């Protein structure tokens, strides 16, 4: 068996069941049957996949896994790379020109967080040890959850009031085979 990364979805099971009851499913049996039953039997979600193409997990770890770090933003990653450069684990910060908070295309053209580029980033642990990125990717269903943002290219364009008019989504069309989670 492969090592995997999970999201503790079971901690949210009751809340998701409660919210599922507020959705106007068409047909209704999808929400009470297929999807509702899936929620009732919910298990923790294995969100990692062993592939090359896709969204990389933003997780770095020491070789012995005594320290694991999940990076929450590009600004945080830039700061962590600066620490790694100062510790001598990297020679330069490839994202040093990135300006956190600047949502312009020009700013985001300065970075590529896909493989193989992100795999070249070595962070430094609290003990000065190298931390390498976990090689797995995020399950594409996790990407699908970004639909409300991606449809408007938010926050890079069409933010503010325009975004608020479509979030959260009022209608999502899925094939019945997609309603099992």
Go through the PLM ranges and name each one:
Residues 1-181:
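Structured secondary-structure scaffolds
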């Amino acid at each position: 068996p492969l090592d995997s990364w999970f999201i503790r979805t079971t901690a949210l099971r009751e809340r998701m069941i409660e919210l599922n009851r507020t959705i106007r499913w068409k047909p209704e049996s999808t929400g009470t049957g297929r999807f509702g039953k899936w929620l009732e039997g919910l298990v923790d979600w294995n969100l990692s996949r062993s592939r090359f193409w896709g969204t990389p997990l933003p997780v770095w770890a020491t070789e012995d896994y005594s320290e694991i770090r999940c990076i929450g933003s590009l600004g945080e990653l830039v700061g962590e790379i600066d620490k790694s450069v100062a510790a001598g684990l990297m020679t330069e910060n490839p994202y040093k020109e990135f300006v956190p908070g600047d949502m312009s295309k020009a700013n985001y053209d300065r970075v590529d967080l896909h493989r193989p580029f992100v795999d070249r980033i070595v962070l430094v642990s609290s003990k000065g040890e190298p931390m390498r990125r976990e090689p797995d990717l995020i399950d594409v269903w996790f990407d699908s959850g970004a639909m409300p943002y991606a449809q408007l290219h938010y926050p890079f364009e069409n933010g503010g009031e325009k975004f608020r008019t479509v979030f959260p989504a009022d209608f999502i069309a899925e094939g019945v085979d997609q309603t099992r989670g």
